[in-house]
């Protein structure tokens, strides 16, 4: 019985994001922004789900299994304005959105998963938060 419990915990760990390479398996899919923070002129601004709806703001990112992505956004932020399609790449806890035509438009985010939600964090060189967003997958949206 004890061996069975250890085996099930080991199997669970193998499927978890802590195992090298398995975290990229959680990324592919359609992700919808439902909350974000941005640091504007020394003020940390927070917009929740109701704020996004009332302001008609949206950000939808589709990550394909072949490491392509597409982005649809209507946000009053300059972060995503120059990049709509490209490739994505993961190294440790960073995801890079790569512009195939101009590397200067590449975007790098720290990312994490919590309760099946995707968190993306982008800071500038001084540590100021340019974007800290929380995303739900369409799968979890349909389950609601």
Model-flagged regions — what are they?
Residues 1-144:
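Lipid interaction determinants
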């Amino acid at each position: 019985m004890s061996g069975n419990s250890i085996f099930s915990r080991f199997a669970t760990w193998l499927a978890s994001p802590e195992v090298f390479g398995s975290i990229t398996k959680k990324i592919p899919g359609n992700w919808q922004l439902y909350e974000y923070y941005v640091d504007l002129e020394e003020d940390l601004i927070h917009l929740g789900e109701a704020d996004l709806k009332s302001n008609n703001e949206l950000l939808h990112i589709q990550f394909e299994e072949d490491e392509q992505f597409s982005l649809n956004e209507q946000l009053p932020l300059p972060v995503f304005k120059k990049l709509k399609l490209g490739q994505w790449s993961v190294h440790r806890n960073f995801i890079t959105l790569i512009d195939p035509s101009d590397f200067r438009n590449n975007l790098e985010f720290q990312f994490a998963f919590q309760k099946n939600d995707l968190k993306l964090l982008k800071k500038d060189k001084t540590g100021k938060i340019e974007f800290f967003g929380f995303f739900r997958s369409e799968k979890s949206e349909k389950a609601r």
